Swiss-Prot record:
Its EC number is 2.7.1.219. Belongs to the four-carbon acid sugar kinase family. The lineage of its organism: Bacteria, Pseudomonadati, Pseudomonadota, Gammaproteobacteria, Enterobacterales. Disruption phenotype: Deletion mutant is unable to use D-threonate as a carbon source. This is D-threonate kinase.
């Protein structure tokens, strides 16, 4: 996640989010802070629906929605979306966002020149008319009391508010001013913008700061942001292969991929994995797999290396006091846990699952409610996505253990590589 946008209403979430999406960012709008976003999102837009709330409730909503995302490392870029006509709890929400993101400065540039919203000499103008003289002043839910933005902000914030006028923006002085304000402590900086180029200059000045300020604006400033601020590098991510089948076909496919240097393998001790003290084996497998995936290597979890492993099942059943069915179910369930743990710690580009029991167990561990089939990699080997799962719309290829030629696994890895470049 590269960027978090906190908006106070749904349509505002969307009109700002689309500025980033149209430049190629994977942008997701959440209607509630409790929702779980996609692992592949570049930009997360959270709607607090707080515009008409009492100021203290709005501040609490913003802080609660934003603070968990600012505890990660590296911290994402934070953008506080506000109404371009300054309706709502501007001061309270900006202050809460500064506290949650631990930013000393907030830069407010809510102009949208293409929509007739501009800022000149610290005042909000709508098609050239001061805000207080427009219909927005008498908004039934959130009326406006001033055209001067600093006055609106100061009504709900004790943080000092400064104004930077157009001439300073256009002569290139904004960056130095922001640095100077930061040296004085906390500050909210209201910046003039009349044309799109002014917003570009504001974005550039913000990027030049040693510590990125909280950006506060509407669709206009969002559109002016350079893409490297909110888009992750596109790269092919490794595939996690869970080879739980003991079939000869699956063994040949795994061996073929290893011989061709297409993947690395983590061998699983089935006896340890099904034991009552499997935690150590699970932790070891997860650690090894994550290390390989972090090196962008396709990684295979293998439960059977040799044909004679099949002959050991009866002995393992006797030792574990389980039937073949019980043993298979426990192994599948534990592999599901392993897969979930790996996915929580590593970035992957897709899943390849061999064996029906394994595929079912992994789907369950990931919380999938179904499987959406999209295409066929090879005869009887589909590619699709799990529905409402922990891995969103990452490709998942499933294969019955005995299906496929020796090259099927390599073909599947190539297929996923060509489909996705990851997040």
């Amino acid at each position: 996640m590269k960027m978090i946008v906190i908006a106070d209403d749904f349509t505002g979430s969307n009109d700002t989010g689309v500025q980033l999406a149209k430049k190629g960012a994977r942008t997701e709008v959440m209607l509630s802070a409790s929702q779980k976003p996609s692992r592949r999102a570049d930009v997360l837009v959270i709607n607090t629906e707080s515009r008409a709330m009492p100021a203290d409730q709005a501040a609490s909503a913003v802080y609660a929605a934003l603070s968990p995302w600012c505890e990660t490392s590296p911290a994402p870029l934070v953008y506080k979306k506000i109404d371009s006509t300054f309706r709502g709890n501007i001061g309270a929400e900006v202050t809460a966002a500064m506290r949650a993101s631990q930013r000393k400065l907030a830069v407010i540039a809510a102009a949208i020149p293409a929509a007739g919203r501009t800022t000149l000499e610290g005042k909000c103008l709508v098609n050239g008319v001061p805000l207080l003289e427009t219909e927005f002043a008498s908004d039934p839910k959130t009326p406006i009391v001033s055209s001067r933005i600093a006055e609106i902000v100061a009504l709900q914030s004790e943080i000092p508010v400064y104004e930077v006028f157009l001439q300073d923006v256009r002569r290139g002085g904004l960056s130095a001013l922001l640095t100077a304000y930061a040296a004085e402590g906390e500050g909210i900086i209201v910046v003039d913008a009349v044309e799109e180029r002014d917003l570009t200059l504001i974005a550039q000045a913000a990027c030049e700061q040693p510590s990125m300020p909280l950006l506060v604006g509407a669709a206009g400033l969002a559109n002016a942001l350079p893409v490297e601020l909110f888009m992750q590098d596109r790269q092919r991510l490794p595939v996690l292969v869970v080879a739980g089948s003991m079939s000869e076909a699956t063994r040949r496919q795994v061996d073929n991929a290893l011989c061709r240097g297409r993947a690395e393998v983590v061998d699983i001790d089935a006896a340890r994995m099904v034991s009552d003290s499997a935690e150590q084996e699970i932790a070891s497998v997860v650690e090894q797999a994550c290390a390989l995936l972090s090196q962008h290597r396709h990684t295979i979890l293998r439960t059977s290396r040799r044909a004679e492993d099949r002959q050991l099942i009866d002995a393992l059943c006797e030792k574990s006091a389980m039937s073949r069915q019980q043993l298979g179910e426990r192994l599948s369930q534990r592999l599901g846990v392993v897969t979930l743990n790996i996915i929580e710690q590593a970035r992957i580009g897709g899943l390849f699952l061999t064996g029906g029991d394994i595929a079912t167990a992994v789907a369950g561990a990931l919380g999938a409610e179904g499987y959406r089939i999209q295409s066929e990699v090879a005869p009887c080997i589909p590619c699709g996505t799990f529905v409402n799962s922990e891995i969103d719309d990452l490709p998942v290829i499933t294969k019955a253990g005995g299906f496929g030629s020796d090259s099927t696994l390599c073909d599947a890895l190539y297929y996923i590589e060509e489909m996705y470049c990851g997040d």
